[in-house]
């Protein structure tokens, strides 16, 4: 009996985590949330993607980064996937906050939902990006802190499917 339950559990697990081919290969667009940011996303295979982004954070400071994500289909909604992954980012506040010259580097996780429209070349997503600042250079000499306030709403034009 335990073997049958285990086999049913494994079959359910494998069916719910199976991946289908990605809905697109490459897209470009913008993110809003932790700044006004340009985003380029490309899939390396059916489930793994790189999101390279850069732009303007609050008060005109510069920011950028790269996220590596693994995508999983949500079987009940065509075109909807969830994703998780990790990455790195930087923020440069030099000169925009008056006397403060601030540079920050962080490592981050990411988790989100992504929807790709079937009939138009558009993809939208929302994500949460908790970040641990591993280097910070400013007048206050703070190091290693948690930033739980990063995330974004993204819209991208699909360049090729």
Question: Which residues fall in each region the model found?
Answer:
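Short glycine/proline- and aromatic-enriched beta-strand/turn motifs that initiate or cap beta-hairpins
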Residues: 20-63, 160
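Outer-membrane beta-barrel "beta-signal"
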Residues: 146-161
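Bacterial Sec-dependent N-terminal signal peptides
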Residues: 1-24
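Short glycine-rich beta-strand segments
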Residues: 31-35, 85-93, 110, 129-135, ...
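Extended interaction regions within the primary functional domain
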Residues: 126, 131-135, 144, 149
